[in-house]
């Protein structure tokens, strides 16, 4: 696994062992040393989990003792940054939760903020959020005033409802407004990476709470700065693809007087792993220039025989009255790791400002 080897391979694991040994000379670290040599068949997360468990096994003392060792390692001269920090931060979170005290919880939060510039602690913090969201959120909100952009990003990225690779936090899913104060504090942040995290956080929320998201972005757009428009466009991307009328209107896409010709397909049957091409014509039949968000929806066959749609961007354009636009696109059915294709009837339709039309069926052949 070259990708995992590059990020958290044997050299990184040995570097972690060396840094911990320097901080705790009397610790044997036999479990950690052994773990460093058996990473090869494991995924990145499995490697992190193995090294986390090895740290916990080799440093079995209480939370204060464990935290002291990590702080000493962080102050040391040996390398102590990059992906080797992932198992460290998750071990801190495990220890803080297991201690069962407010002091350990608060100190664990502080340590994650201190370490996140070395490697984001967005995955580790989920354990603490899941354990006690009410106690964690005031601390997280305080991070929004940090002078360190990595800490400010941790405040919004670490609390995302659907953070990739991370465990879910039921209390955040149950109360979508719980993290809004963090977003309100950071949507004007000077750092683009922090603002992008705010947008991704809102996009997560839009999956289950579109009305909350469009209300939030409407408030921001009422008093924008030079970056608000871009942030909102990124935050609303899923709602735009779904044709949400309020989201479309916020970005200037209103009900349009247009005619749509097509999509016209270049084949009625597509070999497995092949491509299908299509063309579509759009004409503004109104009397005013019209701004259009033009997408296409590919309805894929599922294993149970039903169809499920996925929206793909075509273009954004403004058409003058009477103006025509011709578009062509090729869609690939090449095998990818994130989607399994099933042979059978598929369908394609064009979506203009959230309104779908021209649904046309074709067949994906078996391998």
What is each of the regions a protein language model found here?
Residues 258-261, 302-316:
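Short beta-strand and strand-turn-strand segments in soluble, beta-rich domains
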Residues 1-247, 271-277, 288-291:
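Surface-facing alpha-helical segments and adjacent helix-coil boundary elements at the starts of domains
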Residues 335-345:
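Short glycine/proline/serine/threonine-rich loop/turn segments at secondary-structure transition edges
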Residues 264-271:
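Short beta-strand segments of immunoglobulin-like
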Residues 309-336, 364:
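A beta-strand/beta-hairpin structural motif
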Residues 246-260:
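Proline/serine/threonine-rich low-complexity linkers at boundaries of modular beta-sandwich domains
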Residues 275-283, 287-302:
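Beta-strand-rich binding/interaction modules
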Residues 335-337, 352-360:
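Short acidic/polar inter-strand loop motif in beta-rich domains
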């Amino acid at each position: 696994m070259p990708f995992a080897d590059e990020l958290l391979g044997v050299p990184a694991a040995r570097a972690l062992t060396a840094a911990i040994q320097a901080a705790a000379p009397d610790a044997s670290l036999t479990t950690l040393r052994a773990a460093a040599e058996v990473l090869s068949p494991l995924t990145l997360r499995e490697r992190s989990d193995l090294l986390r468990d090895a740290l916990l096994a080799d440093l079995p003392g209480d939370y204060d003792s464990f935290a002291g060792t990590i702080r000493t390692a962080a102050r040391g001269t040996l390398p102590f940054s990059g992906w080797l920090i992932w198992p460290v931060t998750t071990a801190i979170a495990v220890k803080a939760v297991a201690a069962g005290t407010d002091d350990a919880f608060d100190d664990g939060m502080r340590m994650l903020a201190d370490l996140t510039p070395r490697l984001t602690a967005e995955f580790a913090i989920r354990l603490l959020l899941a354990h006690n969201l009410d106690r964690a959120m005031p601390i997280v909100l305080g991070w929004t005033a940090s002078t360190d952009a990595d800490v400010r990003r941790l405040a919004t990225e670490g609390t995302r409802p659907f953070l990739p690779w991370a465990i879910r936090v039921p209390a955040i899913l149950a109360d979508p407004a719980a993290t809004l104060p963090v977003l309100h504090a950071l949507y004007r942040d000077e750092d683009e990476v922090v603002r992008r995290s705010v947008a991704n956080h809102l996009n997560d929320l839009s999956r289950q709470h579109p009305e909350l998201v469009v209300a939030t972005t409407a408030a921001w757009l009422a008093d924008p700065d030079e970056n608000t428009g871009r942030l909102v466009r990124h935050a609303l991307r899923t709602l735009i693809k779904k044709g949400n009328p309020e989201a479309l209107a916020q970005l200037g896409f209103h009900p349009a007087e247009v005619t749509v010709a097509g999509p016209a397909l270049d084949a009625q049957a597509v070999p497995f792993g092949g491509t299908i091409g299509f063309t579509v014509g759009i004409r503004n039949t109104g009397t005013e220039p019209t701004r259009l968000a033009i997408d296409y929806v590919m309805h894929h066959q599922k294993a149970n025989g039903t169809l499920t749609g996925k929206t793909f961007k075509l273009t954004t354009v403004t058409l003058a009255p009477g103006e025509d636009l011709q578009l062509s696109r090729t869609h690939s059915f090449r095998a990818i790791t994130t989607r399994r294709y099933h042979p059978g009837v598929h369908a394609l339709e064009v979506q203009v400002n959230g309104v779908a039309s021209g649904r046309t069926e074709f067949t994906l052949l078996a391998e």
